[in-house]
Regions:
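N-terminal, positively charged/glycine-rich alpha-helical extensions of SAM-dependent methyltransferases
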Residues: 1-26
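Conserved alpha-helix/loop element of class I SAM-dependent methyltransferases that forms part
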Residues: 20-27, 32-54, 64-68
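Structural alpha-helical scaffold elements that stabilize or flank donor/cofactor-binding regions
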Residues: 48, 122-124
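Class I SAM-dependent methyltransferase SAM/SAH-binding core
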Residues: 54-121
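A short SAM/SAH-binding and catalytic strip from SAM-dependent methyltransferases
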Residues: 117-119, 127-142, 157-159
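A short glycine-rich, Lys/Arg-flanked "PGG" loop and its adjoining helix->strand segment in the class I
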Residues: 138-152
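Conserved beta-strand signature within the Rossmann-like core of class I S-adenosyl-L-methionine
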Residues: 150-161
């Protein structure tokens, strides 16, 4: 392994100059390494999309992943808490018939206190047979509330402490 030619601070300064839109980290291509998983979140979701009339994508970012899963059920809805991403997601997902709903995000899962709030998902009880969530904080009780009886919740989370 060769020594890096640039310091961490130089790399950080370079990264901060990159435009940040949606959930597109392509500027990191070739600059980071990840260990591959034995499973694919996208493929797990794709397998569950077949035959459901609606899906909720919590924290869609710029809608990049959800758009790659098209065709989508007619009742597909996405939420996004990061205000700059809402319009990016709408532009990407509206042509696919997806409504993007701005929300206030839940606290990080590891920071939630027992009995803290029901969350902020503006949907009636048992609205969705499938709820997907990639890297978005959530209140478990709120997911249970909006998930139809017998429905599926698929999530992919990351973090140093959980």
């Amino acid at each position: 392994m060769s020594a890096p030619t640039r310091s961490f601070e130089q790399l950080l300064a370079e990264a901060e100059q990159q435009p940040f839109q949606g959930w597109d980290f392509s500027y990191l291509e070739g600059r980071m390494e990840e260990a591959p998983t034995s499973w694919s979140y996208a493929e797990m979701v794709r397998a569950r999309l077949a035959g459901v009339p609606a899906v909720l994508d919590m924290g869609t970012g710029g809608g990049e992943l959800l758009a790659r899963l098209a065709p989508l059920p007619p009742g597909t809805v996405a939420t996004e808490a990061y205000t700059p991403n809402v319009e990016i997601a709408r532009a990407r997902l509206a042509p696919l018939g997806v409504e993007v709903v701005p929300v206030v995000g839940a606290p990080d899962n590891s920071d939630q206190q027992p009995g803290e709030g029901r969350g902020n998902l503006p949907f009636p009880d048992e609205s969705f047979p499938l709820v997907i969530n990639r890297h978005e904080s959530y209140y478990p009780a709120e997911v249970i509330r909006i998930l139809q009886r017998g429905g599926s919740f698929i999530t992919q989370q990351v973090g140093a402490t959980h």
